[in-house]
A protein has these predicted regions:
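Bacterial N-terminal signal peptides that target proteins for export
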Residues: 2-12
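Serine/threonine-rich, low-complexity intrinsically disordered segments
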Residues: 5, 21-24
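Bacterial N-terminal signal peptides
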Residues: 11-20
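Intrinsically disordered, low-complexity terminal tails/loops enriched in metal-binding residues
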Residues: 23-164
């Protein structure tokens, strides 16, 4: 009886370890795939840029900058991409993040539904650009924050998940 119990425990432990190893081994591959899709959709090499996703009381912002001040091409591509994103999001079109992440990010359905309640302002910044997102609608605000928190986690930016 004790031998049977030990074997069951060992088998369960081995299955748990194997599952952990498989999931852990696939994580970098999932990140690599997301980054490849992102490079294709955004039109620039993510490794040459820095993404920031910031939560604010009225919404938040998406900021992307070239890592090197002399990387004029990346800065140009960032500006083109974020200008396009601001227009797409204002129209309720979130195809770009859905393609990059291979799923519908949290908050997107509500942001699409309440698109008339949300403003997306494009702004050029040093070495890149930003999209400032704002709303006075509490439901839209919650959705914006869900969307930005998802971006922070997916892109592993280390940005605060708190409203600043």
């Amino acid at each position: 009886m004790k031998t049977h119990l030990r074997r069951s425990i060992m088998a369960s432990l081995m299955l748990a370890i194997a599952t952990f190893v498989i999931v852990y081994a696939q994580e970098p591959k999932a990140d690599e795939q997301m980054n490849k899709r992102g490079d294709h959709v955004m039109g620039f090499d993510h490794a040459k840029t820095t993404h920031l996703f910031l939560l604010r009381e009225s919404g938040g912002s998406i900021e992307i900058t070239a890592n090197k001040s002399d990387d004029v091409e990346s800065s140009k591509q960032i500006r083109m991409h974020l200008k396009h994103i601001a227009m797409m999001f204002a129209d309720g079109n979130f195809n770009a993040p859905m393609l990059i992440h291979d799923q519908t990010p949290p908050g997107v359905p509500v942001m699409q539904e309440l698109k008339g309640e949300i403003k997306y302002n494009f702004e050029e910044i040093d070495r890149g650009a930003a999209v400032r997102i704002s709303t006075k609608n509490p439901t839209a605000l919650k959705a914006i924050h869900e969307f930005l928190r998802f971006q922070i986690k997916e892109h592993k930016t280390g940005d605060s998940l708190d409203i600043g």
